[in-house]
């Protein structure tokens, strides 16, 4: 019987079974790896980050950003910069010192995989105001914000998501960037925001924060 089966095992059939087995092993290993980083990221986030950034990365605390749904590379880069002291975040001083690059990557991937409920983040902020939203949308278009942050403002790679982010955090951050006081942040933003007054930045922040919220 085995000899008969062997005779039927043509090179093409052998290649097919090898390929199918290889694909099966690949997906199995991928699933294991995904489960590993997801578990590790969640385990790291709960004791260290949840108190301020929310259990699933959606902040309800004034001036604290939501991390859910941010691009993985952006989160990863910011975590490294904070750990290395290249970006100043007083509340996080020393918190990341003992985390390895692999730990930070796991955190970044986990937060990037979470869903940002913009309504939750916006709940304690200013209620949506149509006039300010329109003004902010106009400012965003004139400043070409969608060129880097994407037309949806969901961010990409090293560029952060603006859609649904906390309004107060966005406003404070843009003021710091405009005034050249955002140490460790993208210097391009300083020139982009230069010349905008506080009211214009408030409208921009209001507009971005309401994207994705229910009417």
Regions found by a protein language model. Give the residues of each.
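Gly/Gly-Pro-rich "capping" loops immediately C-terminal to redox-active cysteine motifs
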Residues: 42, 57-87, 93-99, 137, ...
